[in-house]
Amino acid sequence: MDLTFLAFFVPFAAALVAPPIMRALGHNGAWALALAPAFLFLHWCGFLPEIATGGRVTGGYQWIPSFNVNFSWFIDGLSLTFALLITGIGTLIVLYAGGYMKGHPMQGRFMSFILMFMGAMQGLVLSDSFFMFFVFWELTSITSFLLIGFKHDAEKSRRSATQALVVTGAGGLILLAGLIVIWNVTGVSEFSLLLASGDILRDSPFYIAAFVLVLGGAFTKSAQFPLHFWLPNAMEAPTPVSAYLHSATMVKAGVYLLMRLNPAMGHTDAWETVLPLFGGTTLLVGTILAVRQTDLKLMLAYTTVASLGLLVMLTGFGTHKAIEGAVLYLIAHSLFKGALFMVAGNVDHEAGTRDVTKLGGLLSLMPVTFGAAIFSAISMGGLPPMTGFLAKEELYYGVAVSAEPWALLVTAVAIAGNALMFVVGFVVALKPFLGPKVETPKHAHEAPVLMLAGPVILAVASLVSAVLSPLYHEFFSSPMASAVIGEAV
């Protein structure tokens, strides 16, 4: 049996054994459970050479032949990069959760939910058939509901989880209608075949209907204005969930969908007007709300809303350089945002608060956490020598030199939004650690190894990917941009 087929089920198998493993080994069970996503990461790495040379991999099995429903997968630069982010960062999140949830009576259940969430997101980005894609899309909503509402005895957690489920679940039904329209217009129900049917779809009188329905699904999942409200409220979830949700998983599912469909649905007036309009608005709204917060997680959550808006804006802008900037920024954001959320979790876990007005002077007590924070903030701010610098240089260039009528406005919005994100990033990285020591609810000390591995490795990855930019471009950003554009770059 194909190993890739089995890879779809590995996270769910790990989820089944997570409770007994955590009961038997305690928090150290995280090391054993992390082997599952680590194996998947290595498996997907095996596709890098072929994908880097412009190859695409498809495969699968017939499921319901009478309805042309297959269990099929499609691996190209876009899906492979997402799969590597999901499993690579997922490995670190499992380790982090082991330390963060140490001693919690339900840590086994929590690990099980995290692994199911990972499996749902991995399946979503690798699915070729529309049916498989929709099943995994809705499964991400269900598993995120379980994670956001993990503290089910708290009214606020239950309300936030329900809100996220209603918004994203309803968006999924809207998306299903859009996929059915696309299927009826083009006669294909697999993404790998749809990419060659773009002219048929764009010329159809049903294009606008499909476009609006697809956007309904994508905008709910990726928290675009005015549907952004559920994402900050999801911060009621434990920090490992927040870090994973914002760096590599569900909130980028909508962006993934738009990037996947760009070759087939892009290059129209509707696409190149609506996406920059809503994306740019979301970018500005997110950053303005971020600078008004004092809670570390809320500050980072609103900058995620802003970053998702930036990615949608660039995806809709339509030029090759803008797309290249978008894919560079997507990867960079996954690295620095995952690290910063784990930093916020370390501070909250060890000091007892994440209110920046009640924090200060932690540098001598948490030097490793501070190191990860400052490197990640430098990347978030778009400063050298981090990969965030490469991403922001590329995206500014991609919109500023364009002859598109929106170019000047989009450039101004991108600069304004990123300037505010720069401020937020350094407030998160500096305020808790510098200045005079502030009395905190708990006697602060450095986080345990399980909680340091994630932020340190992601911060180092932000540096290494910039230093080794030729390899980074060859194996990651270039194949991904080619998949989004629909031709080699």
Task: List each language-model region with its residue ranges.
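Transmembrane helix-loop-helix hairpins at membrane boundaries of multipass inner-membrane proteins
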Residues: M1-F5, A15-S112, N184-R202, F229, ...
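Membrane-embedded helix-loop-helix hairpins and adjacent transmembrane boundary segments
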Residues: D2-V10, F39-L42, P49, P405-L408, ...
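Hydrophobic alpha-helical transmembrane segments of integral membrane proteins
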Residues: A7-F8, A15-L16, L33, S222, ...
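Hydrophobic alpha-helical membrane-insertion segments
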Residues: A34-L48, T168-L179, A373-G381, G454-L471
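Hydrophobic transmembrane alpha-helices and their helix-loop junctions in integral membrane proteins
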Residues: L92-F133, I142-A447, V467
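Short phosphate-coordinating micro-motif centered on Lys-Gly-acidic
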Residues: E138
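Hard-cation-handling environments
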Residues: H445-V489
